[in-house]
From Swiss-Prot:
Function: Acts as a backup for CMTM6 to regulate plasma membrane expression of PD-L1/CD274, an immune inhibitory ligand critical for immune tolerance to self and antitumor immunity. May protect PD-L1/CD274 from being polyubiquitinated and targeted for degradation.
Ranges where the MARVEL domain occurs: 49-176
Amino acid composition bias (Acidic residues), ranges on this chain: 1-11
The organism of origin for this protein: Mus musculus
Keywords: Membrane, Phosphoprotein, Transmembrane, Transmembrane helix
Protein name, as recorded: CKLF-like MARVEL transmembrane domain-containing protein 4
Length: 208
């Protein structure tokens, strides 16, 4: 009987020792979800943005600007060439800048740079693209030689202008909402800080 009691005591000590060593061991099995580790280590696509109006318009703008640029690049001869060169610059610039913003917004990369006002950045991009695409399309329509590539470039230029104009309107609304929300947050923060300052003298008088 005594041997059995000693054996039970030895097993209890061994189990408690193993539990302590297991708790203090640095090599613990991770229970972190796989999706969370992927989100921390890699990029994560935002399907809600791509399904929204601004995301769809961004995709349409990139496609239209690219097609307009391809159409203008197929023209081999021009006289005068100023309108063609201007349209080429506008379509290429709009494609690159809008494409970069689309990648940043769809992958939530802009959240890693909170110092930049991205709503205002998007508004400026869409507004300038609307203006310059409209001017470039009018100039190319007035100075083209009625070739198929030039006519196609003009058509896609005006389509891109329309897409950027709608996006400018939506971006303006989003920017106004963000400005109002920021001002409201600043007001609430200022009220909270003022209440804290007013309550400190009373606390000091009670302490004395």
């Amino acid at each position: 009987m005594r041997g059995g009691e000693e054996l039970d005591g030895f097993e209890g000590e061994a189990s408690s020792t193993s539990m302590i060593s297991g708790a203090s061991s640095p090599y613990q099995p991770t229970t972190e979800p796989v999706s969370q580790r992927r989100g921390l280590a890699g990029l994560r696509c935002d399907p809600d943005y791509l399904r929204g109006a601004l995301g769809r318009l961004k995709v349409a703008q990139v496609i239209l600007a690219l097609i307009a640029f391809i159409c203008i690049e197929t023209i081999m001869e021009c006289s005068p060439c100023e309108g063609l060169y201007f349209f080429e610059f506008v379509s290429c610039s709009a494609f690159v800048v809008t494409g970069v913003l689309l990648i940043l917004f769809s992958l939530n990369l802009h959240m890693r740079i909170p110092q930049i006002n991205w709503n205002l950045t998007d508004l400026v991009n869409t507004g300038l693209s609307t203006f310059f695409f409209f001017i470039a399309s009018i100039v190319l329509a007035a100075l083209n030689h009625k070739t198929g590539a030039e006519i196609a470039a003009v058509i896609f230029g005006f389509l891109a202008t329309a897409a950027y104009a709608v996006s400018t309107f939506l971006a303006m609304q989003k920017w106004r909402v963000s400005v109002r929300q920021q001002s409201t947050n600043d007001y609430i923060r200022a009220r909270t800080e003022s209440r804290d300052v007013d309550s400190r003298p009373e606390i000091q008088r009670l302490d004395t």
